[in-house]
């Protein structure tokens, strides 16, 4: 069994894939496995990966899989999980890269602490600017209960750090069904995944290796595109709320889920001019319907704890939604 499997989905990233592959080579070990998943690229990425699979096979174990149609990053990661054989599992996106030696440091930390998963800080790269983004957990190199790291509801916590590629996960989590992503979500697929992991895993730790470089602001990224796919955050958070409401600690955890949902919704509404006009209209309609679906007493409490601008924006939408429902 390989010590570590790194699952790397690629889709139309020919410009960046060579950097990603070079960084994998700089982290290779004979007991590491690289799972390269091509999500039906049509820009030349496939040829890059064919060469990469041959090159990397001399320094590590390699599995190269190609989808027969584009299925999205959630499905590509799931395909990688199905192929991966490692004791530990990690993720990397096809347009990001790793510092040399990072993976060995990550595995050493995970083995030393012997917990279900470990998380790391990462470097956000925007053009030439680089910023370290830290896991919002105060204790380092100490095994913690991931449930406790969900709270408090009114602070930035570990479930707000949705960088699935900044960490490593023991195979037992995969065997328990905790590492698969919800397919069909075009964005925010990492949010239900992160919540489920924190609710269901038994232990985790934040460790010090810093070596993931995340490209931000790529023109093809969904964060830069104003089409209907970005509205999938609503389906993602509906899933979070539904699953958390069924949890044994729902009374304790649900306020955080609702607050996070409201915060992300308010963020998108504040930037609705970046959406295509028809999509902006759907954003308002779908957000209003989502507010109606939330537990109303809890929603009222959450809005009272949010800052004035975001709370006012959501209250206006909530009033319109209520008026529209009454008129109907």
Predicted regions and their residues:
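Catalytic core of nucleotide-sugar-dependent glycosyltransferases
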Residues: 209-217, 223-251, 265-267, 273-294
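Nucleotide-sugar donor-binding/catalytic module of glycosyltransferases
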Residues: 1-232
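Membrane-interface aromatic/basic loop that binds lipid-linked glycans or pyrophosphate carriers
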Residues: 31, 273-328
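General helical secondary-structure elements
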Residues: 67, 73, 108, 115, ...
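P-loop NTPase catalytic cores that bind/hydrolyze ATP
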Residues: 258-268
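Residues within HEAT/ARM-like alpha-solenoid scaffolds
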Residues: 249-260
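Short, intrinsically disordered/low-complexity patches at protein termini
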Residues: 1, 41, 54, 156, ...
């Amino acid at each position: 069994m390989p010590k570590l499997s790194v699952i790397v989905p690629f889709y139309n990233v020919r410009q960046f894939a060579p950097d990603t592959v070079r960084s994998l080579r700089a982290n290779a070990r004979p007991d590491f496995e690289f799972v390269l998943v091509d999500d039906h690229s049509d820009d030349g990425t496939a040829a890059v990966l064919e060469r990469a699979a041959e090159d990397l096979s001399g320094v590590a174990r390699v599995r190269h899989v190609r989808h027969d149609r584009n299925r999205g990053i959630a499905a590509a990661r799931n395909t990688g999980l199905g192929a991966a054989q490692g004791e530990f599992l990690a993720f990397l996106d096809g347009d990001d890269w790793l510092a040399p030696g990072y993976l060995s440091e990550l595995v050493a930390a995970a083995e030393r602490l012997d917990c279900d998963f470990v998380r790391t800080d990462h470097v956000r790269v925007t053009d030439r600017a680089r910023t370290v983004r830290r896991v919002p957990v105060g204790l380092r190199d100490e095994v913690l209960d991931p449930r406790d790291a969900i709270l408090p509801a009114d602070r930035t916590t570990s479930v707000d750090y949705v960088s699935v590629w900044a960490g490593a996960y023991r195979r037992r989590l995969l065997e328990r069904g905790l590492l698969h992503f919800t397919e069909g979500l075009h964005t925010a697929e990492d949010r239900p995944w992160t919540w489920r992991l924190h609710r269901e895993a038994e232990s985790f730790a934040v460790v010090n290796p810093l070596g993931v470089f995340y490209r931000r602001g790529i023109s093809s990224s969904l964060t830069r595109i104003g089409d209907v796919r970005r509205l999938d955050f609503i389906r993602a958070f509906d899933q979070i709320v539904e699953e958390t409401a069924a949890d044994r600690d729902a009374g304790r955890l649900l306020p955080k889920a609702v607050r996070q949902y409201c915060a992300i919704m308010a963020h998108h509404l504040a930037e609705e001019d970046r959406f295509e006009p028809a999509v902006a209209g759907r954003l308002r309609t779908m957000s209003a319907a989502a507010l109606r679906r939330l537990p109303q007493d809890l929603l009222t409490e959450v809005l009272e704890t949010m800052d004035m601008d975001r709370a006012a924006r959501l209250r206006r939408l909530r009033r319109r939604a209520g008026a529209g429902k009454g008129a109907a």
